[in-house]
Amino acid sequence: MNPFHDLEPGPNVPEVVYALIEIPKGSRNKYELDKKTGLLKLDRVLYSPFFYPVDYGIIPRTWYDDDDPFDIMVIMREPTYPLTIIEARPIGLFKMIDSGDKDYKVLAVPVEDPYFKDWKDIDDVPKAFLDEIAHFFKRYKELQGKEIIVEGWEGAEAAKREILRAIELYKEKFGSKE
């Protein structure tokens, strides 16, 4: 089984999607799912003394403008593990440019955590936490000499639109599994 190609994008897209976690919150190791084999590989250890502030992964059967699966960040109170599947509710869209490429990311919360039951949109997230996420992504490649431009945040509706677009981009690239 290759989770990138064989899992659905979610049980109720775009309201609830599957987040396939590659990197748990608190990690300095950057793992990536190998798109051909479905195995997880260590891409690199972060050059800077930063760690991921969220669980980080992809939405299965999506493709994005950076020529990779569509990224998703899930706010977790405790880290999960690589290759964990989380039913996640999109609440925002983080917009950034990575070395000249559009590299937007969905921000989501786990459906099965009652702590986040009232978090429906970006305005429900404390600004200090959004600033922390933005700071991480602005600086995490700095010691590699790569430039990241943070464009800011948009709400849940923007995230849902991009998820649907990313599913269509996947179908264009890989064909439909339906």
Swiss-Prot record:
Residues engaged in binding Mg(2+) 2: D71
Subcellular location(s) per record: Cytoplasm
TM helices/strands, residue ranges: none
Chief subcellular location: cytoplasm
Alphabetical keyword list: Cytoplasm, Hydrolase, Magnesium, Metal-binding
Cofactor: Mg(2+)
One Pfam family of this chain: Pyrophosphatase
Binding-site residues for Mg(2+) 1, renumbered to this chain: D66, D71, D103
Catalyzed reaction equations: diphosphate + H2O = 2 phosphate + H(+)
EC number: 3.6.1.1
Gene3D superfamilies assigned: Inorganic pyrophosphatase (3.90.80.10)
UniProt GO molecular function: inorganic diphosphate phosphatase activity; magnesium ion binding
Recorded superkingdom: Archaea
GO biological process, one term: phosphate-containing compound metabolic process
Binding site for substrate: K30, R44, Y56, Y140
Assigned GO CC terms: cytoplasm
Family: Belongs to the PPase family.
HAMAP family to which the protein is assigned, alphabetical: Inorganic_PPase
PANTHER family referenced in this protein's UniProt entry, alphabetically: INORGANIC PYROPHOSPHATASE (PTHR10286)
Protein purpose: Catalyzes the hydrolysis of inorganic pyrophosphate (PPi) forming two phosphate ions.
Assembly: Homohexamer.
Identification of the protein by name: Inorganic pyrophosphatase
Record organism: Pyrococcus abyssi (strain GE5 / Orsay)
Gene: ppa
